[in-house]
Design a protein with these regions (language model features):
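Generic alpha-helical transmembrane segments of integral inner-membrane proteins
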Residues: 62, 66, 70, 74, ...
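Membrane-interfacial helix-loop-helix connectors in multipass membrane proteins
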Residues: 1-6, 74-116, 124-143, 165-168
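Start (N-cap) of specific transmembrane helices in multi-pass transporter permeases
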Residues: 48-69, 143, 147
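Hydrophobic alpha-helical transmembrane segments that form the multi-pass transporter/flippase core
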Residues: 18-19, 110-111, 115-120, 146-152, ...
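Hydrophobic alpha-helical transmembrane segments of integral membrane proteins
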Residues: 55-59, 148-168
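Hydrophobic alpha-helical transmembrane segments of multi-pass membrane transport proteins
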Residues: 1-40, 68, 125
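Hydrophobic side chains within alpha-helical segments
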Residues: 24, 32, 40-41, 60, ...
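Short cytoplasmic-facing helical segments at TM-TM junctions of multi-pass membrane proteins
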Residues: 30-54, 137-140
């Protein structure tokens, strides 16, 4: 269970949750700026709107999502310890021993890399959907929904690819 928590569950589930929350927020924020012509105003002033609006979001998520993945791993392991101890299914010493038995430190690196890749996917897809939104506020909602759906599917595909590439 440690392997599943560290290698697959934490990074993927955190990414899917954040695709829904962060992805929709980014797409709707940038889409609203496009609809209200704020992006056009930036371009008229000579500002590269894509790097000004999107790059800070990508950098922030690529740094922060792996930290959330670490937190998710920690909470999952502590939760497993609490349940095993409180229900009497396992002795606390056995649980701790099982955590360290055949532990590969690369597993943590693997989870952090996946978190960073998923962060880039979520942010770039959501920013793209918002940046190219056209029409009215209904289109912003559609762009936000499209960003979440495409990000979620892409995360699952890249999860498979990264698992095949990085699995030792």
């Amino acid at each position: 269970t440690r392997e599943v928590m560290v290698l697959e569950f934490s990074s993927t589930v955190v990414a899917l949750i954040l695709a829904g929350k962060v992805g929709s927020n980014i797409a709707s924020e940038i889409g609203t700026m496009r609809i209200t012509e704020q992006i056009d105003a930036l371009e008229i002033m000579g500002v590269n709107s894509a790097s000004y609006l999107i790059l800070p979001k990508i950098v922030a998520t690529v740094i922060f999502f792996p930290l959330l993945t670490l937190f998710s791993i920690f909470v999952g392991i502590v939760g497993g310890y609490a349940i095993a101890s409180l229900t009497g299914m396992m002795l606390p010493g056995d649980y701790i021993e099982g955590l360290f038995y055949c532990f590969e430190p690369f597993s943590i690196t693997y989870a952090l890399v996946k978190g960073a890749v998923f962060a880039f996917i979520i942010t770039s897809i959501s920013a793209y959907c918002g940046y190219y939104a056209k029409g009215n506020s209904l289109e912003v909602g559609r762009a936000s929904t499209r960003a979440v759906v495409v990000s979620s599917i892409t995360i699952m595909i890249f999860n498979l690819i990264l698992t095949h590439i990085m699995r030792v």
